[in-house]
């Protein structure tokens, strides 16, 4: 989301907060002749043409797809050809059509990762939950919590 928001900032001279607000409501399925995209932020209204907005979002997704495609060409073997690519939901949760666009561009299935936890099974939470899980795993492996649990045989 951040890289695409920066593209929007540069192209349309928007503050970062406005660019992320526009991305949160992005829909790649909109007809190109749809009315302009509008966001009100800080008492000011920002309006950009839908066609250019969609083109810029797709261009940002294409840049990401190029990086992933290059990685797959250089680093993957045959075992990865039939497996899906999992995308964390934080940046893509609000962009309708992003996964489909990436799937077409990469010629493979792209799926959104969502943790299997009650109330946290939203794709938008997957990046945060993954970081929390990683941090708590490190803490359990080497921190004072491990020493404390070892006292009780845990």
Protein language model features and the residues they cover:
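Helical "lid/coupling" subdomains associated with nucleotide-phosphate turnover
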Residues: 1-21, 28-154
């Amino acid at each position: 989301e951040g890289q695409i928001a920066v593209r929007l900032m540069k192209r349309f001279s928007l503050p970062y907060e406005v660019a992320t607000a526009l991305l949160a409501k992005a829909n790649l399925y909109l007809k190109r002749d749809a009315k302009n995209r509008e966001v009100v932020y800080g008492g000011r209204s920002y309006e950009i043409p839908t066609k250019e907005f969609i083109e810029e979002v797709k261009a940002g997704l294409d840049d990401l797809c190029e990086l992933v495609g290059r990685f797959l060409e250089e680093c993957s073997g045959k075992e990865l050809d039939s497996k899906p690519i999992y995308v964390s939901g934080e940046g893509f949760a609000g962009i309708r059509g992003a996964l489909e666009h990436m799937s077409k561009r990469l010629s493979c299935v792209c799926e959104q990762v969502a943790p299997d936890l009650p109330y946290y099974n939203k794709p938008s939470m997957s990046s945060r939950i993954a970081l929390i899980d990683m941090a708590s795993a490190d803490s359990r492996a080497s921190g004072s919590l491990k020493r404390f649990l070892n006292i009780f045989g845990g």
